[in-house]
Amino acid sequence: VAVSKFHPAADVERVASYGQIDFGENYVQEAMQKRNELDLPDLRWHMIGHVQSRKAPAVAGKFVLLHTLDSIKLSNALEKTLNSKNIGQTALIEVNIGGEEQKSGVMANELPQLVEHVLAHCPHLKLEGLMCLPPVFDAGEAARPFFARLRLLRDELRKNFDLPLPQLSMGMSGDFEWAIAE
């Protein structure tokens, strides 16, 4: 996923001309503006930024993957819109893997409750895996324990909820090798 936040639509178009089709945006309004400017229906847009519950109607069903599902409140807001339009939305649950107050994401100990809620009450949301941003930004190997912890959490959910959860979204340019290793 190429992160295109703060880059103009012309840059997205240029990168897409080289074969890149997956683009990640942090802000709903910026993503929608670029999508409207570009006549490129084959692009796959990812929402990688925090989504407030009140913005759920603008997100629901508009992205190939929502990387930042982080609360029961947001899952309910998404489900309401998805149900009214009879469409689905694939999502990753964002886990606050470092337990940092300033970061978004569900705390690891609350993760099973969120999964249980989505499975029981949000039939239009399809859980595909987990996402995290480690507390050490672009720190190479120092991020690896956080990636390992996310993988273990995913493995526990697979076992306890009988879910495939094939995706782990973790790592950026400075630590992606360690994310892949996990």
Where are these regions (language model features)?
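Non-catalytic positions within long, well-ordered alpha-helices that form the structural scaffold/packing
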Residues: A16, I180-A181
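Conserved alpha/beta-domain cores
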Residues: V1-G174
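Hydrophobic residues within well-ordered alpha-helices
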Residues: V59, A179-I180
